[in-house]
A protein has these predicted regions:
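Two-component/phosphorelay signaling modules centered on CheY-like receiver
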Residues: 14-32, 121
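The feature encodes the CheY-like receiver
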Residues: 17, 61, 89
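Acidic, metal-coordinating helix/loop segments flanking the phosphotransfer/catalytic sites
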Residues: 33-53
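Acidic catalytic/metal-coordinating carboxylates
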Residues: 35-36, 64-68
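Short amphipathic alpha-helix used as the core "switch/output" element in two-component signaling
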Residues: 42, 66-77
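The short loop immediately C-terminal to the conserved phospho-acceptor aspartate in CheY-like receiver
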Residues: 58-59, 119
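Alpha4 helix (beta4-alpha4-beta5 surface) of REC/receiver domains from two-component response regulators
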Residues: 67, 87-104, 112, 116
Length: 124
């Protein structure tokens, strides 16, 4: 079944953006990817109503995923956000709850888990 809303994927590693875009597109999602969070934020400002979900890495230059998520929420308070990090989840719990992210994925993320967690985040 095709999805009508888009997902914004932001990670400073191009390979992750490409793999996520391919995996989610196979499940009918329209996916737009950025390796620069500042450019992603500018794009989101212009197109926020089109996005059902933002998936972002936590650690990226020049803006962290937490900063990006806070900016996304300032633009669209009901935005759904999934953060991902290779670092321990316990170190991130406070920040995740502070911005009210819908989920936190631990890198590396297998594609089956990614698709399942995206479905859950978008349904809530």
């Amino acid at each position: 079944m095709p999805h009508t809303q888009s997902i914004l994927v932001v990670d400073d590693e191009l390979d992750i953006v490409v793999i996520f875009r391919q995996a989610l597109a196979r499940h009918g999602y329209a996916v737009f990817g950025f390796t620069d969070p500042a450019l992603a934020l500018e794009h989101f400002k212009l197109n926020s109503r089109d996005y059902a979900l933002v998936i972002s890495a936590v650690r990226m230059p020049p803006m962290s995923g937490f900063e990006l998520a806070a900016s996304v929420k300032a633009i669209k308070p009901d935005a759904k956000i999934v953060l991902m990090s290779a670092f321990e989840v316990n170190d991130l719990e406070f920040s995740t709850s502070a911005i009210k992210a819908n989920d936190l994925l631990r890198k590396p993320v297998d594609m089956k888990t990614l698709v399942q967690r995206v479905r859950v985040a978008m349904a809530n």
